[in-house]
């Protein structure tokens, strides 16, 4: 039944042969079609093209299996097969020599000789990788070499090639080593210059702002005492009125006579003097008296100085108000 269907579908060009394996082209999946067809060509009845697709059988020669595909439409034969030698693994045929330390076979190590070859190849790869990187060596200079180098550096920081070569001959160094030394020496010199400028700025700042302006813990009570002493020693009428409790020096004694304008003449005069006298005189007199007693008022900070003067003025105002109320 199958043969009848094939004979109707295809026209056989040659007689079929038995005992041959046929597989589809290499581009698709290997699929077993028929076992009884061998070396035949098929013509498609439905296809309008006259191109003939011929499939050669699998040929076996010298234990090789080759899969080929040919097309009668073209003159060239395209080989899509992979040669395989029976009795050997496939990866031994696929291995090819590769450069850059990749020439390693895929087969396992069979003996000590092959293992030694692999070790030698690995050592060679390591040596090639390490040699590609530049190794940096630290040069130890002697005292004579440093002396010669410093002499030239004092003259010029940027010696030319001729000077570097002459210096290299005298110091028994290479010109590259001399050049590197001058680069490092210039960097060190610039660093010292920056550090010196910073220190100079710090010293200038310390000289401008003296340390003596710092506050003293024992200066406030002494300054306050000096202020009171200065007020007592000054010859102003107002300070002499405020310091003592006795009001005889400030106003006339209170008389039980009827109130007259002449009874308050002394108090009114002193009050007029106090009203016309500026408050800055209190602070000025206290500063002068404090300076003459040996403690300069400039040693106090600005904030503490202001607070002390305000406190003194408030205390004086309270005493003056109390004296006025007692006199009334």
UniProtKB/Swiss-Prot annotation:
A motif (OAR) lies at residues 308-321. GO terms for cellular component: Golgi apparatus; nuclear body; transcription regulator complex. InterPro entries: HD (IPR001356), Homeobox_CS (IPR017970), Homeodomain-like_sf (IPR009057), OAR_dom (IPR003654), Paired_Homeobox_TFs (IPR050649). GO terms for biological process: anterior/posterior pattern specification; embryonic limb morphogenesis; embryonic skeletal system morphogenesis; mesenchymal cell development; negative regulation of transcription by RNA polymerase II; neural tube closure; positive regulation of epithelial to mesenchymal transition; roof of mouth development. The keyword Transcription regulation applies. SMART domains: HOX. One of its GO terms (molecular function) is DNA-binding transcription activator activity, RNA polymerase II-specific. Residues 194-328 are annotated as: Transactivation domain. It is found in: Nucleus. Residues 134-193 bind DNA. It comes from the Eukaryota. Keywords: Activator, Developmental protein, DNA-binding, Homeobox, Nucleus, Repressor, Transcription, Transcription regulation. Sequence-specific DNA-binding transcription factor that binds palindromic sequences within promoters and may activate or repress the transcription of a subset of genes. Most probably regulates the expression of genes involved in the development of mesenchyme-derived craniofacial structures. May therefore play a role in beak development and regulate beak shape. Binds DNA as a homodimer; required for transcriptional activation. The OAR motif may negatively regulate DNA-binding and therefore transcriptional activity. It is found in the C-terminal transactivation domain that stimulates transcription. Belongs to the paired homeobox family. PANTHER family: ALX HOMEOBOX PROTEIN 1, HOMEOBOX PROTEIN ARISTALESS. This is ALX homeobox protein 1. It comes from Geospiza fortis (Medium ground-finch). The gene is ALX1.
């Amino acid at each position: 039944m199958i043969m009848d269907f094939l004979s109707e579908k295809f026209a056989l060009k040659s007689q079929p042969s038995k005992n041959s394996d046929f597989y589809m082209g290499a581009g698709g999946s290997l699929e077993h079609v028929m076992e009884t067809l061998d070396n035949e060509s098929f013509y498609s009845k439905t296809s309008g093209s006259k191109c003939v697709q011929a499939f050669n059988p699998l040929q076996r020669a010298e234990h090789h299996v080759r899969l080929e595909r040919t097309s009668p439409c073209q003159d060239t034969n395209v080989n899509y097969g992979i040669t395989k030698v029976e009795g050997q693994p496939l990866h031994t045929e696929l291995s090819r020599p590769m450069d850059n330390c990749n020439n390693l076979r895929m087969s396992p190590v069979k003996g000590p000789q092959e293992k030694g070859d692999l070790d030698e190849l690995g050592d060679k790869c390591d040596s090639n990788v390490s040699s590609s990187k530049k190794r940096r060596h630290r040069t130890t200079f002697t005292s004579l070499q440093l002396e010669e180098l410093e002499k030239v550096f004092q003259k010029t920081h940027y010696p030319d090639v001729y000077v570097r070569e002459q210096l290299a001959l005298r110091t028994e160094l290479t010109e590259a080593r001399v050049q590197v030394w001058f680069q490092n020496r210039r960097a060190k010199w610039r660093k010292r210059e920056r550090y010196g400028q910073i220190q100079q700025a710090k010293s200038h700042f310390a000289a401008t702002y003296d340390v003596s302006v710092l506050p003293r813990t024992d200066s406030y009570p002494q300054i306050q005492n000096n202020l009171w002493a200065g007020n007592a020693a000054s010859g102003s009428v107002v300070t002499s009125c405020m310091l003592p409790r006795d009001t005889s020096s400030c106003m006339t004694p209170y008389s039980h006579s009827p109130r007259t304008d002449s009874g308050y003449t002394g108090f009114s005069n002193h009050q007029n003097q106090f009203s016309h006298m500026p408050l800055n005189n209190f602070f000025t007199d206290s500063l002068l008296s404090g300076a003459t007693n040996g403690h300069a008022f400039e040693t106090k900070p600005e904030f503490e100085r202001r607070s002390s003067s305000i406190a003194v003025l408030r205390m004086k105002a309270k005493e003056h108000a109390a004296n006025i109320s007692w006199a009334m």
